[in-house]
A protein has these predicted regions:
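A short, hydrophobic, proline-anchored segment that marks a local hinge/packing element in signaling
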Residues: 164-166
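Non-catalytic DNA-recognition/assembly elements of restriction-modification systems
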Residues: 1-52, 58-75, 168-221
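DNA target-recognition domains and sequence-specific DNA-contacting regions of bacterial/archaeal
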Residues: 36-162, 221
Length: 221
């Protein structure tokens, strides 16, 4: 059951406060939005992944399907593989987690996975990469707690995780989440570009890949 909170969302996602994001939140509240404390079990379904060792796959830089493992590098993706079968294929637009580091990553496309991994599937409409970053920040904030329990107890610990989620008219405020995450991403890029200028590296600019890496770091990945 969700509990309403009248206060703003402080420091999430990305643990950054700025006048722009604070103003965005204030406007959201004034327009009838509210912040609710919701347990993960109300928003996600956690499933163990059908697992296959990497020896079962053919890896290639031109392959289509990500192979997700316990690594925390490259968004948990060990490499890309050719299609194998439907039995082991995991639906994308979901959150994958490796049980060793307990770090969550957004998986846009259908994927295969190795041992000791699970996937959280959203139970609500409108889920995408921007919305995923919001929830990843909360789940990764709980990584130390997850690491402190036995693997067999992780599912219950995950479902009991409390999340602050914006709601409007009885539904998750997807548009607000996307806008706020976008503002936070832009804020971090401005901070880094300001640092480069102070450091005398004004001829440097961030590539698209570097911006994506920065956003992943901001989300706790």
């Amino acid at each position: 059951m969700a509990r309403s909170r009248s206060n703003q969302i402080g420091g999430q996602p990305g643990k950054i406060n700025s006048p722009r994001t604070d103003t965005l939140t204030e406007k959201f509240i004034c327009d009838g939005g509210e912040i609710k404390t919701v347990k993960a079990r109300d928003l996600f379904l956690l499933k163990g992944n059908p697992q296959l060792n990497k020896d079962h796959f053919t890896f290639s830089k031109n392959s289509k399907y990500p192979y997700f493992t316990r690594t925390v590098f490259n968004n948990g993706i060990y490499g890309y593989v050719d299609y194998l079968d439907e039995e082991h294929l995991i639906k994308g637009n979901s959150l994958a987690v490796g049980m060793m580091a307990m770090q969550f990553f957004y998986m846009e496309h259908d994927f295969y996975a190795g041992q000791f991994t699970k996937t959280a599937f959203p139970l609500f409409d409108g889920f995408d990469e921007k919305v995923a970053l919001w929830f990843i920040s909360w789940f990764n904030k709980s990584s130390k707690k997850y690491l402190g329990v036995l693997v067999r107890d992780f599912e219950n610990e995950f479902y009991e995780t409390e999340l602050l989620v914006p709601y409007k008219s009885g539904k998750i405020a997807i548009d607000f989440i996307r806008e706020r995450v976008r503002e936070l991403e832009e804020e971090r890029v401005r901070e880094l570009e300001a640092y480069l200028k102070v450091a005398g590296l004004t001829d440097c600019s961030l590539t698209l890949a570097e911006r994506e890496t920065l956003n992943n770091l901001n989300s706790g990945g």
